[in-house]
Amino acid sequence: MINYYLLLTKPGIILGNLVTVMAGFLLASKGQFQFGLFFSTILGLAFIMASGCVFNNYIDLEKDRLMKRTQNRPLVIGVIFEKQAIVFGLALAIVGAIILYFYTNLLTLVIAELGFIIYVFFYSIWKSRTVYGTAIGSLAGAVPPLVGYCAVSNQLDLGAFILFAMMVFWQMPHFFSIAIYRLQDYSAANIPVLPLKKGIQITKIRILLYIIIFTLTSSLLTFFHFTGSLYLILTIGLGLTWLLMGLRGLKTSNDQQWAQQMFRFSLVIISVLSLTIPFDLVN
């Protein structure tokens, strides 16, 4: 039974986001690592993200029944009841908020809660009503590195805004790739993603534009002397690779396979850049 509750929290999403939390935390630390603060930030935000995912499962319940990839989720198959999920989600949110309030700072808690509100009350509810759901979701998804950064700095400065913008622009091609790859599922659930509303070709062009913007935005960390040349080289190299993969998609005969490759590479690029940041800081 514990495993089903764990599945409700979408642990894969949490772990992926914690990599970017680490990047933000270490960028702001500038070599002065505080283990206790790092642990508290990771733990507190993990609880809040887990809560958001539980409520997302609850809100998406009827849609999840219609999509093949979500038909075996705990709420769908009935191993966990809706009221139990709500109580579980509330408990996670409270614990996470307590940890961040007492062991980090108020700004960090406020940013984390804003991310939670955007994800649960805006993205989860509106993604089935508007094609702009992806853009709304990208705002929530850009919060984790900001939380890591502000836990150390306790302020919103240029570094924080660059990190936030990076994640917003990364998530757009990331989500659009998923939308193309899982197009049949989204169609079955009547979720108005861009490929369904505007067509796959227009979505591919949007992907290319966002990859360019993401690469340029990511490079700003070096231009403003937060990171060194290694980070810049990797940013440009991986960004160009991603862009070339995207260009090949304009003529591909297998959109689903191409979109899956784009999705996987999006995970590679954000992971590599996040892990490079702490090793190439400019003090």
Swiss-Prot record:
Membrane topology note: Multi-pass membrane protein
InterPro entries reported in the protein's UniProt record: Protohaem_IX_farnesylTrfase, UbiA_prenyltransferase, UbiA_sf
Pathway: Porphyrin-containing compound metabolism; heme O biosynthesis; heme O from protoheme: step 1/1
Reactions that this protein is recorded to catalyse: heme b + (2E,6E)-farnesyl diphosphate + H2O = Fe(II)-heme o + diphosphate
Keyword Ubl conjugation: no
Pfam families, A to Z: UbiA (PF01040)
Primary enzyme class: transferase
Family as reported in the entry's similarity comment: Belongs to the UbiA prenyltransferase family. Protoheme IX farnesyltransferase subfamily.
Any further remark recorded for this protein: Carbon 2 of the heme B porphyrin ring is defined according to the Fischer nomenclature.
Protein's job: Converts heme B (protoheme IX) to heme O by substitution of the vinyl group on carbon 2 of heme B porphyrin ring with a hydroxyethyl farnesyl side group.
Entries under HAMAP family matching the protein: CyoE_CtaB
Protein name: Protoheme IX farnesyltransferase
UniProt source species: Protochlamydia amoebophila (strain UWE25)
